Regions:
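Hydrophobic transmembrane alpha-helices and immediately adjacent juxtamembrane helices
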Residues: 1-292
């Protein structure tokens, strides 16, 4: 059973820890979460150790995964399907979209099984349960920064060889946009994680669902390609990941279709998903040991 921890200091006995049941729909103690930041960082380290343990290439997969995926996109969608890339090198176009999408997908997939995979730990010792999903998105953030560095190296190569790519003022917004992507992934991930305590099918479906979600996002095609299909373009713009991907391309390639309305909608969706996720997480953590 999840509890809320508060500290008090009796006059003679020194510090003690008082654990009280949580109450309310939105009962998340951010101060307590910050106090356990060392534990969160320890979980981040554990995530890396578990993920690459007994692998031949180890952390090199952080770079190989998006690189191989980008090459496949370039061959299939660029060379074979002949999809436009808004006048920029196809390799950079696909890597830009894939870098942002991989960050989001990792945030969702890695937090989606928080309750199920950590049930034994949750049942033995008290700590803020939210440290688990937070550690997962921080792990994904580190992976993203490494992949973004690789993207920058390829960008410099193409720029040096005369490709028409450039950084724009949108670059200033990239840190905030990536924070939004991380929070959106956290929100969606903990929603799924909360529901999987009762509906295990979601744990299986989430990976497939994220893959389908990618094709509803402008990862392998430019949003401008849908100008002749207004209804389809509206549907794609309803995807909260459309704006972050387009902003990243606008920032680093000088292309992309970015509007203030799309950004506001994406941010609002992120806030709603995060609030809903935290509410569900707060409610489910009280009883999940009875269902997992």
């Amino acid at each position: 059973m999840a509890e809320n921890m508060q500290a008090s200091r009796p006059a003679d006995d020194g510090w003690t820890t008082v654990i009280r049941p949580r109450s309310g729909w939105f009962d998340i103690n951010l101060k307590e979460l910050w106090q356990y930041r060392d534990l969160t960082l320890m979980f981040v380290k554990r995530n890396f150790t578990v993920l690459y343990k007994q692998t031949i290439l180890g952390p090199a997969w952080i770079l190989l995964n998006p690189l191989i995926t980008t090459l496949i996109f370039n061959v299939v969608f660029g060379n074979m399907a002949g999809m436009p890339t808004d006048g920029v090198p196809g390799f950079l176009f696909y890597m830009a979209g894939n870098t942002v999408w991989t960050f989001f997908a990792n945030c969702v997939n890695n937090t989606a099984n928080t309750f199920v995979t950590n049930s034994q730990v949750f049942g033995k010792v008290y700590f803020p349960r939210l440290t688990m999903p937070v550690s997962q998105v921080l792990t994904s953030l580190i992976n993203f920064l490494i992949q973004a560095a690789m993207y920058l190296l390829f960008w410099l190569y193409f720029f040096a060889t005369g490709a028409e790519v450039r950084f724009t003022l949108w670059t200033l917004a990239v840190p905030l946009v990536m924070l939004q992507v991380m929070l959106l992934g956290l929100g969606v991930g903990i929603i799924v994680s909360s529901l999987t305590t009762k509906y295990r099918d979601l744990a299986i479906a989430v990976g497939f669902g994220v893959q389908l979600w990618m094709y509803a996002s402008p990862v392998v095609y430019p949003l401008s390609m849908l100008d002749e299909s207004p209804r389809l373009k509206v549907l794609v713009e309803l995807n909260p990941m459309t704006a972050p991907i387009e902003v990243f391309r606008a920032a680093t390639l000088g292309t992309g279709s970015v509007s203030a309305g799309a950004i506001v909608y994406s941010v609002a969706f992120t806030v709603a998903a995060l609030v809903l996720g935290v509410v569900l997480f707060s409610r489910i953590e009280k009883t999940f040991m009875d269902t997992v």
